[in-house]
Every structure is written in structure tokens, then in C-alpha cells.
Amino acid sequence: MPAGVNFTSPQRTATDVQFLADRTFTVDGERQTQQQIFDTVFEMIANARHIVLVDMFLFNDYLGKGSEQHIPLSDELSNALIAQKKRYPDLQIHVISDPINSLYGGLPSKHFVELKAAGIPVTQTDLTQLRDSNPAYSGFWRLLIQPFGNSEGGWLPNPFGEGQVSVRSYLNLLNFKANHRKLLIADNGSELTALVTSANPHDGSSAHGNVALRFNGPAAWDLLESEKAMLALSGKALAEVALPQKAENTDSNLSVQVVTENAVEQASLAMINQAKSGDKLDMAMFYLSDRDIVEALKSAQTRGVVLRVLLDPNKDAFGRQKNGIPNRPVAHELTQAGIIVRWCDTHGEQCHAKWLMHRGAGETTMLLGSTNFTRRNLHNLNLETSVIVKGPANAAPFRRGRSWFDERWHNLYGRHYSVDYENYADERRWPQLLYRSMEATGLSTF
């Protein structure tokens, strides 16, 4: 593994911890959207004077085959960064993203071109430094394709939008590896603040349901350290940030901890395995397939933990229909074990959150971020970042997190979010076998 990956920070006290959510729901059959996450991102950028670091997986305006209404998040983020750089020319801004946005060198990203022209460096992560998540294919690719690089243009259609790309863009895509992180670090003039999320500045994803955590203090500096490692992985570096590090506020009863890659799995398993009879464990997840997590949930049910699992039905992907794998076979397995599962009732958008909350007798723990609960996301293959918050149950981020989950689970306030398990159940044998095979071998997109 590259240096700095699989990172676990200390637990840091924090005073300004905010839970944020983007909601999509229907009222009388009409889809509506409420968004908080990128409003907060733009506010953080506007307040920055010393440093802005953006690390986002999807940063483009591609819609795929989707025709639903969307928000031009990619333009809005690019414009916000360029405008702030013009206001404060000495402001240090870095953008880190995944090379999927340029089709692995096959099609220039207009946003990256504009950012570079404004004096903002853009680092597309060197994915060749990462372990292969699809080893049956990647050996062939490394030997026969990688040495020849890629070139712009070609005769094949762009799989995500307009333009044409080479066959090598498609062959690169089949490695199924990514910098999947989604975060922002910025100062507010006096201290460092950070935001970790499941949301992308991607127009085709702008209606997705997502969550985020905004926080300040030493945990934000820990996140910055983990991002320095991401720059180093691609041969880049961050200049010194001219901002004093404030001491931890020992009066706070909340702690924030940064975890990346496999450290997310270890933290998640600890949350589930430590839950006792009568404790409450709630999960909202876009992809759930990791066998260790699934078995831990079943064991928690046996111990008497009260579980609620809200899953995306895996039927929509930017205008394309999906086959329900992995979530529908996994949901069948969970319901067979007695766990209550509900589905997000999506209409083109995705239920994209990656969120887990444990409520025990003395302390509440919440985990959220970029990390789906799959082998590829949890086993040091993709690059991922999540955060863990711990503290008393009545603390504001936990109240808001519970309210967000309950609203979706119970369809509160006249808003329709979710349906019973039976609505999207698939109990056929072949999807279960296919899911197990795809999860084990890496021959999958999840």
C-alpha cells in the first residue's frame, strides 16, 4: 500500500460539528429536492483566506442517459474556486480528483482546464499506485495496455456523455479502481475547517440523497495530513499552511476521528460488534456487500440489537437500469436473519449515503463519508475517507442524524422516501450466486 493510506487519526475533541443532508423525496407523486451540502461547501470556499483543498471523485457535468432535472454542481464548484482565487491571489487552492473525469486521459475535462488556467493546480490521482481490485483483468492491462498510455480522441462514444474516446479509455475503466474520496478542507480566516461527505460535484448525481459532516479543530488538521499523502502518491506536495493550529477544546463532549480505507471497515465492525442487547443500530447504505459486515449485522441481530437497515434498491444509474446487485441479494439474507430492511423508493436518483449510527446506553457513535460497505471500498483497494463522531445522544449532530434517518424510514411530514422490503425483494438463487462471485473476485462495479 502507498504511504499514508489506511489512516486512523486520534479521537479529537471538536466544538462545531454539523450534520448535513441532501434530501430527495416525492409529495403527491412529484419529486422534490432539498440540499445543504454544497451550499455549505460554497460558503466554506468563500470564507477561505489561506487554504482550500478539494478531493472529489466525480467532478464533471456528464448526465449519462439521465434526463431528470439536475443542478450544475460541477460548474458551480469550479466557478466558486476560480472566483475565490481571483479575490485572493495568494490563497493556496488544490483540487484532487479521479482520472475518470478525463476518461483516463482520453477526453479533456473542461473544468480542470479552466481551473489550471486560473492558476489552480489539479491532481488526477495516479491509480497505478493502488492495488488491483479486479486482478483477473488488471494483470493483462498492466502488461499490455498501461505501457502505451492513452491519447485524446478516438472512435468510441464517451460512456458518460458527449465526445469520443479511444479503446484504451474503456480498457482503463475495466480496472475498477478509483480515488473515491469526497471532502473539502478550508480555513475560515482563523482556523481550519473540514467537510467529509458522500456527495460528488457531479451534475448527474445532483439529485442523489447524501450526507456530510462539517467540523473544525485538530481533526481537520488530521484530515489535511491524510490528503498530503494523496498528493505525494501522485508526486505532488502542499505548501506550508500559514495558520496556527489551535489546541483541542477539552471542554467539548464530542470527538471526531478520521478513518480511511480499511480503517473504515475496522471502525464499522467495532461499532456493530460492540452493540449490546437493546442497543439501536441504524444503517443507510448505497452498496452493502462486504461479507464481514453482513455477518456482523446478523450476529448483532442474534444478540438482541435493534437493527434498521435502509438500502438503495440498486435499480438506477444515470438513466440506466441496474439488476439490483448487490443490495437485493444481501437484503434477502438479512431479512432471513430477522433484520428489518426497507428500500429507498428512488425515481432516477440514488440513495447514495454511507451512514451508520450506534446508540448505546452511555454513548452514541456515528460514521459517515465516501465509503460503501463493499470489498472494493473497505479492503485497501479504492481510496476512501470517512469520519466517526462520538458523544452523548442529545448532541446536535446525533439529533439531526436520527431525525434524518427517521424521516426517511417512516416517510414523515407528508414526504415519501421509502417502501417495505417486499417492494423490491429478489429472492431468486442466481442473483445471490452472482453477487457472491462478483464480491469475491472483483469482477463488478461495486
Q: Which sequence ranges carry the predicted segments?
A:
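Charged, low-complexity intrinsically disordered terminal segments
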Residues: 1-446
